[in-house]
Amino acid sequence: MQQKSRVILIHGLHQTAWIMRLLAKRLQAAGFDTHQYGYRSMRDGIKTNSARLNDWLEKHHHPDQPIDLVGHSLGGLIIRDFVTQYPKWQIGRCVTLGTPHLGSVCADYIWRLTPAVVGRSYVDALDGTVAPLPEHITLGVIAGNRPYGLGQLFLQYHNRKLRKTNNMPSAEHLLHDGTVYVEETKIEAATDHIVLPVSHTGMLVDKTVAAQTKYFLQHGQFDHSELKHL
């Protein structure tokens, strides 16, 4: 009999494990065994936090039990680093929520103004330099297009700059969730990618995001039939 996967939920920058609690409870209601992994997003870099996740698993997880991973924002980049650095674990399926796989324009502005606000996370993650996703990993990407949050101030400024150039991007390229551009969430190696009407933080409490995350973990793809009703 195949062992049931454990779902590890990984929060983003300036957050703690508790922020993933509602999503975890919704996955638990669907029968998933979950754990909310907490880490120091400001003080430590992505590789240190990946190593600590590995240490936690060595103490609390049996290597024969498959692992599914769900990461919000920076948490998704930790997933990418972790699955590359620690291939010994049986990784099932991964879902990233609002993760800037191609780097973050918003984080770049903040880094130039006040580096301490993004800390070590910018240097080896939010600048777009995370290791490529291994080919065997099944990854689903959820992006949001509701521009709510403090990060929208930087992105609105950036959009105005882009509109003044001769090579103005399409309206689709200007969509963001208040912190991360939809375009920044796209990664060629992803198995599936969807855009939902949610903001960067709002996606963590959104029922549709939870339902789509659950569906991907179960089927290896998102439920595109449900997207027609949004």
Model-predicted regions and their roles:
Residues 136-230:
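C-terminal catalytic-base region of ester-bond hydrolases, centering on the histidine
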Residues 17-25, 177-184:
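Short, functional N-terminal and low-complexity linear motifs
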Residues 1-5, 21, 28-32, 223-230:
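Alpha/beta-hydrolase fold catalytic core
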Residues 5-18, 26-41, 46-140, 150, ...:
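Serine-dependent carboxylesterase/thioesterase catalytic core
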